[in-house]
Amino acid sequence: MTQLTAQDVKRFGTERGLDLVGIANIERFEGAPPRMHPAAIMPRAKSVVVVARRILRGNWRGIEEGTYWPTYTYFGYHGLLNSFFMPMPLYDLACFIEDHGHEAVPYYPGVPEKQPPEQPLRPGAVGPDVHLQIRIAGTAAGLGEMGWAKVFMTKKFGPRVRLHAIITEAELEPDPLMEPGTLCDRCMACVKGCT
C-alpha cells in the first residue's frame, strides 16, 4: 500500500477530464437509510469521492430557440455524458485508488429499471440495488448544495452538472461542507420557471 492523499485523487481526476472532485468521509452519511448508505455497498468504506462533469451551457441553446433538442439529450442530461464521458475517467480514478492499495467501487447513479426484491440475499444485509442519493453525496463532499427545488448546484457550473461517485476504503481528508444558502437564496426563480 502506498501513500495516497486527497490531493493526489483530485489531481488525477481532473487530469482525466473530470471538472470537479470532492471527498466526503463516511461519517457524513450517518443517519442515511440503510439502502442508501455507502457502507451497504462497501462495509469498510472510509471515504466517498464524488465527481462532476459539466453540462455545456450551449446544450440549452436549441431548446431556448425552440429548434433543437438532441444536443441536451445526448450530451447533457443523460446519453453520452452519463454513459460514456463520465464512466471512463471514473473507472480510471478507481483504478488509480486501487493501484495505491485501497479497494474502490465506482458508483453509477442510474435508477433501476424495476424495483429490486426487498429481501436481503444474505443475513444481516440490506436488499439488493442500494441506491445512493447522488445529490446528497455531492453535498456531503463539499461540491455544492441543493437548492429550493432540490436541484444540486455548484459554484462554478450552477445546476449544469452530472455526478458520479467512488466508494473506497482509502481514508482521505474530506472537503469542507458548503454553507447552506451559499448558492440558493430562495429567490424562487426555479418555481417560476416550472409554472
Language-model region placement:
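Non-catalytic, usually N-terminal nucleic-acid engagement modules in DNA/RNA processing proteins
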Residues: 1-91
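Catalytic cores of enzyme domains
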Residues: 32, 39, 75-195
